[in-house]
Amino acid sequence: DISGLTPCKESKQFXKREKQQXKXLE
């Protein structure tokens, strides 16, 4: 589980980045 390896702070940033990538792909 990635969320378990990274701090909550980084996890949120990662989620944001993932959403942005998803928008770019769509």
From Swiss-Prot:
A biological process (GO) of this protein is: photosynthesis
| One Gene Ontology CC term in the entry | photosystem I reaction center
Tell where it localizes. Plastid, Chloroplast thylakoid lumen
Report what the protein is called.
Answer: Photosystem I reaction center subunit III
What does the function comment of this entry state?
A: Probably participates in efficiency of electron transfer from plastocyanin to P700 (or cytochrome c553 in algae and cyanobacteria). This plastocyanin-docking protein contributes to the specific association of plastocyanin to PSI.
- Tell me which InterPro entries the record gives: PSI_PsaF_sf (IPR036577)
Q: Keywords, A to Z?
A: Chloroplast, Photosynthesis, Photosystem I, Plastid, Thylakoid
Which domain of life does the UniProt lineage start with? Answer: Eukaryota
Membership in a protein family? Belongs to the PsaF family.
For the region Disordered, what residue ranges are annotated? 1-26
Q: Give start-end positions of Basic and acidic residues composition bias.
A: 9-26
